Amino acid sequence: MSGFFTSLDPRRVQWGAAWYAMHSRILRTKPVESMLEGTGTTTAHGTKLAQVLTTVDLISLGVGSCVGTGMYVVSGLVAKEMAGPGVIVSFIIAAVASILSGVCYAEFGVRVPKTTGSAYTYSYVTVGEFVAFFIGWNLILEYLIGTAAGASALSSMFDSLANHTISRWMADSVGTLNGLGKGEESYPDLLALLIAVIVTIIVALGVKNSIGFNNVLNVLNLAVWVFIMIAGLFFINGKYWAEGQFLPHGWSGVLQGAATCFYAFIGFDIIATTGEEAKNPNTSIPYAITASLVICLTAYVSVSVILTLMVPYYTIDTESPLMEMFVAHGFYAAKFVVAIGSVAGLTVSLLGSLFPMPRVIYAMAGDGLLFRFLAHVSSYTETPVVACIVSGFLAALLALLVSLRDLIEMMSIGTLLAYTLVSVCVLLLRYQPESDIDGFVKFLSEEHTKKKEGILADCEKEACSPVSEGDEFSGPATNTCGAKNLPSLGDNEMLIGKSDKSTYNVNHPNYGTVDMTTGIEADESENIYLIKLKKLIGPHYYTMRIRLGLPGKMDRPTAATGHTVTICVLLLFILMFIFCSFIIFGSDYISEQSWWAILLVVLMVLLISTLVFVILQQPENPKKLPYMAPCLPFVPAFAMLVNIYLMLKLSTITWIRFAVWCFVGLLIYFGYGIWNSTLEISAREEALHQSTYQRYDVDDPFSVEEGFSYATEGESQEDWGGPTEDKGFYYQQMSDAKANGRTSSKAKSKSKHKQNSEALIANDELDYSPE
């Protein structure tokens, strides 16, 4: 027992080391270099995913995953119950909000193009392993539910065309399953099971086959859309948009409808999951995301216009609005034409949910966060066939046992969370130093920030030589660059915000003068009034930045500015969550104009604006990409606000189910993923490799130059780790080493350290290379 209590002695348990090890594991990031230029696309089984997708294929995937449910279901639902003919405005507002998240996805797709896994991979590269697993796990949930819901919706469509004979037969012959669905007549949906299995087989047969099937259905859906537009023009009536009829529920109904219409645009992230299978992802991904959102908006608005002009908004059928609007005018043949389009659109939406799900599973399994057998890629179909079969089976099981109403309620929370994290990642990456983009979470460490503060990222390259850490230097960290001498932090021009590129450009017309940037004669195109305005407000702006403690407006961010942005984004997320919660759950106090409620709202708005302003004043990373999200930091910040608001609008039962799913994911991650991660295995191999040379480490008190002696029988064993140590030796403490006249070389610079160790091994006749 004494040994047990001794092991629990806080002096013996290295709590700090244990916390640091866990902290470093959950925040470790995946190097971007491993996914660039096709690197890392080969699986453990030696098979690559086929790179066969064109820009048109990606647009077809994005449109198909969105337009089915949005055009045939959401338009009628929002028009009747929320916004009336104002559903048109609701779709436009939702489209703007979706485009904000879409441009962030597009930048990430360009930054890390050769990837599968979408937001999961992006988070793994930027935020860290734990957050990436959390996002990927919830993306699996959304695609799983979306597939099951699509199969159930198709089953309901066929049942409706058959006058509900299928559902009655199943309820009478098979029986009901009370408790699995909200309705008392919930029955095992065998037709939905069959549909899910068929689509799973199509996806598993190969990406080219599934994309071809998807394109055919999209063409069919397009033909039906054209038919609706032309046929509907003969039945429109402008009186349904008369005064007071366009916005029957006011702007509150329009905004409520916009929150629902936003879900009709969810699905464009499927484009980002196929980066590894695209022929030219750098240009295809941003173009396909933007084009698919614009096409979906056009389809939704045009259909909503025809729908609300053909029938009064309060008579719209919510289950099949486009079919019933022709029936109301006696055009029964059109019902079956629209039914064909509905089946095609819902099938494409089902395919859009099932297609990315195995690819997210494949990406996570390839990284070791899920079981690695799920990353197997078939050499025949060049698809992650095991992940396809497993995910399709789970989706079919859900479609069989759970009602459509219950499935729809769980569809959006994980996707909205993924959108929010992508916006956060864009904000963080654009303000991090170039050399630390792969692992910017290190900025959370104060010690790392102190080491890096004041050193520009590009000065870690060969053109620049930072002052050695071992040299005694009382001033701040500086650099010497052979190509370009950067101005000091005390330079007024840099603090005011002028670019050092223009200042040190030898081709500048006024190069060599005292002030190259203000020569009116040298640059006649520059406005004289703008120059005078800069001279007038420049000193005041400089003084304001100094008093506010803002950094110099340099072209290159530093570790300190990156750390500032990280903290600001974290606070921004928390404040937005509190703000949206109060707007939603405290709306009664705001509508009553309670002074404290209004004061609280104004205070939070000011705090959010201040954080955005602080982020705006930090220097951005100068790295140019083929596509970059515009108007930073406003676009990602507003996307975060919209996504958080929509997440909080979801029901309580959805959050409870979400919590249960997350708990299962945490068990998998901490029980398996964290210990079998590819990064964990690499770290173990690196530690094992370093231990091979540990005996000859020049940092050791027992250096190769001095040699070492073993303890004799007469000598005390205390200094060698105790009497139980029979073989080998343990390193003595540094204080003992110094007492014996040995000095550690840790005070030396890293470059000198490397040269000494190479020289020691080179001069030795023995071979110390690992076997």
UniProtKB/Swiss-Prot annotation:
Q: Which GO terms describe its cellular component?
A: cytosol; intracellular membrane-bounded organelle; lysosomal membrane; nucleoplasm; plasma membrane
Q: Domain of life, per the record?
A: Eukaryota
Result, substituting R695C: In RP68; uncertain significance
Please provide, alphabetically and separated by semicolons, the GO molecular function terms listed in this UniProt record. amino acid transmembrane transporter activity; gamma-aminobutyric acid transmembrane transporter activity
Role:
Imports 4-aminobutanoate (GABA) into lysosomes. May act as a GABA sensor that regulates mTORC2-dependent INS signaling and gluconeogenesis. The transport mechanism and substrate selectivity remain to be elucidated.
Q: Which UniProt keywords apply?
A: Amino-acid transport, Glycoprotein, Lysosome, Membrane, Phosphoprotein, Retinitis pigmentosa, Transmembrane, Transmembrane helix, Transport
Its UniProt entry gives the catalysed reaction(s) as: 4-aminobutanoate(in) = 4-aminobutanoate(out)
For membrane topology, the record states: Multi-pass membrane protein
Is Membrane given among the entry's keywords? yes
Q: Name one Pfam family in it.
A: AA_permease_2
**Protein name per its UniProtKB record:** Solute carrier family 7 member 14
For bias kind Basic residues, which ranges apply?
745-754
What is the disorder linked to it? Retinitis pigmentosa 68: A retinal dystrophy belonging to the group of pigmentary retinopathies. Retinitis pigmentosa is characterized by retinal pigment deposits visible on fundus examination and primary loss of rod photoreceptor cells followed by secondary loss of cone photoreceptors. Patients typically have night vision blindness and loss of midperipheral visual field. As their condition progresses, they lose their far peripheral visual field and eventually central vision as well.
Task: Provide the tissue specificity.
Answer: Expressed in skin fibroblasts.
Q: Where is this region: Disordered?
A: 736-771
What happens after mutating N209S? In RP68; uncertain significance
Its annotated compartments are: Lysosome membrane
User: Where in this protein does the record say Phosphoserine is found?
Assistant: S465, S468, S488, S757, S769
> Hey, which family's this protein in?
Belongs to the amino acid-polyamine-organocation (APC) superfamily. Cationic amino acid transporter (CAT) (TC 2.A.3.3) family.
Q: Where are the transmembrane segments?
A: 58-78, 83-103, 119-141, 187-207, 216-236, 251-271, 291-311, 336-356, 360-380, 384-404, 407-427, 565-585, 596-616, 628-648, 655-675
What biological process terms from GO does the record include? amino acid transport; gamma-aminobutyric acid import
- Keyword Glycoprotein in the entry? The reply is yes
Report residues carrying sugar chains.
Answer: N282, N676
Q: What InterPro entries does the database record attribute to this sequence?
A: AA/rel_permease1, CAT_C
